[in-house]
């Protein structure tokens, strides 16, 4: 769905774990990383689109997550001119996104990047909460900053465990 201003309706998904980290995924065959996201189909609510995209992109079902919150409004970003397809009608100049913050209830092993048969991502990892703001492609950075700021209190308050630290083995001489 592209609105009269040329923005495609889209949902963004931030999945957090019990350590306050967020899931960060690498786009298939590329070097760019981002949060899962995808378009809203005609007749679909933003929440329905989020659950569909959640399964298509990372293999998680509603029972694997809890919705903690969503953005109060739609956030927009413009695509760089080189990415705008002028030959498509209507022309899409960017995305307007409703974001959802989810808490993972299941084990990491429930994440399956190949669940749809057409993977969007080829790798993923847990990163610190603010890491994505500095790492996402530049044209999405302002939206990431806004959504992360809006979700920060909620996301970081659901940290239920400390991140396990690797034990350093001490050498003995003797």
From Swiss-Prot:
Family of the protein in this entry: Belongs to the Nudix hydrolase family. RppH subfamily.
Keywords attached to this entry: Hydrolase
Protein's job: Accelerates the degradation of transcripts by removing pyrophosphate from the 5'-end of triphosphorylated RNA, leading to a more labile monophosphorylated state that can stimulate subsequent ribonuclease cleavage.
Cofactor: a divalent metal cation
Superkingdom of origin organism: Bacteria
GO molecular function, one term: mRNA 5'-diphosphatase activity
Name assigned to this protein: RNA pyrophosphohydrolase
Pfam families: NUDIX (PF00293)
């Amino acid at each position: 769905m592209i609105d009269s201003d040329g923005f495609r309706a889209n949902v963004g998904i931030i999945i957090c774990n019990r350590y306050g980290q967020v899931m960060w995924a690498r786009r298939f065959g590329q070097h760019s990383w981002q949060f899962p996201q995808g378009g809203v189909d005609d007749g679909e609510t933003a929440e329905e689109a989020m659950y569909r995209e959640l399964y298509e992109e990372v293999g998680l079902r509603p029972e694997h997550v809890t919705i903690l919150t969503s953005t109060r409004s739609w956030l927009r970003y413009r695509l760089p001119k080189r990415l705008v397809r002028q030959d498509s009608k209507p022309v899409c100049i960017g995305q307007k996104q409703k974001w959802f913050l989810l808490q993972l209830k299941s084990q990491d092993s429930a994440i399956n990047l190949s669940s749809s048969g057409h993977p969007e991502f080829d790798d993923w990892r847990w990163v610190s909460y603010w890491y994505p703001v500095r790492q996402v492609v530049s044209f999405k950075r302002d939206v990431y900053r806004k959504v992360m700021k809006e979700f920060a209190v909620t996301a970081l308050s659901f940290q239920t465990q400390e991140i396990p630290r690797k034990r350093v083995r001490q050498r003995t001489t003797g």
